């Protein structure tokens, strides 16, 4: 016979790695064309001037310049938009 009662097994003990989403370039930072500005799920931040959006909603710069975020009101909702102000040649 066993001298100790069998211990129960836990159903916890798992965790997945984070997906590294969030703002990658903040307002006022200089960026090159192709630099990623925001990684997100859905359009929490909308693309503005000189900003493209990938199929996973990643926002990226299409020109070299300076990042600028703005809040704007659309209907009854305040949304955030990100622009890249082109560098002076």
UniProtKB/Swiss-Prot annotation:
The UniProt record lists the keyword Ribonucleoprotein: yes
Residue ranges, annotated region (Disordered): 1-26
GO biological process: translation
Species, as recorded: Nitratidesulfovibrio vulgaris (strain DSM 19637 / Miyazaki F)
Molecular function terms from GO: structural constituent of ribosome
Family (UniProt): Belongs to the bacterial ribosomal protein bL27 family.
Database matches in Pfam families: Ribosomal_L27
Gene Ontology cellular component annotations, sorted alphabetically: cytosolic large ribosomal subunit
Organism superkingdom: Bacteria
Keywords, ordered alphabetically: Ribonucleoprotein, Ribosomal protein
This protein's name: Large ribosomal subunit protein bL27
Cysteine pairings via disulfide bonds: none
SUPFAM superfamilies per record: Ribosomal L27 protein-like
């Amino acid at each position: 016979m066993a001298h100790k009662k069998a211990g129960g097994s836990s159903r916890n003990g798992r965790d997945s790695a984070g997906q590294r989403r969030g703002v990658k370039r903040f307002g006022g930072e200089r960026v090159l064309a192709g630099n990623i500005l925001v990684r997100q799920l859905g359009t929490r931040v909308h693309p503005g001037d000189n900003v493209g959006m990938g199929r996973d909603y990643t926002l990226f710069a299409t020109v070299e310049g300076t990042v600028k975020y703005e809040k704007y009101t659309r209907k009854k909702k305040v949304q955030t938009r990100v622009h890249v102000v082109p560098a002076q040649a």
